[in-house]
């Protein structure tokens, strides 16, 4: 699956775990932490920037919330 992110960035991932990993690897902020730490860090920044809380307990819920809030769109 291919996901469109803000700034016309695209992530190709076969599942939610791969999506989180690719999002982290492409991050200029948190590329050196674990995928789990990245989800938590991203969620903290997102609530400040967008005022929306996203789940971080599983990659599936994290991705689902990013799609629900409009940050990511499956294309």
Indicate where each model-derived feature is located.
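N-terminal acidic leader/helix
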Residues: 1-29
């Amino acid at each position: 699956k291919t996901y469109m992110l803000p700034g016309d960035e695209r992530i190709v991932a076969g599942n939610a775990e791969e999506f989180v990993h690719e999002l982290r690897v492409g991050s200029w902020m948190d590329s050196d932490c674990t995928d789990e730490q990245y989800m938590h860090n991203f969620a903290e920044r997102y609530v400040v920037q967008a005022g929306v809380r996203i789940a971080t307990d599983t990659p599936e819920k994290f991705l689902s919330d990013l799609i629900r809030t409009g940050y990511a769109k499956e294309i």
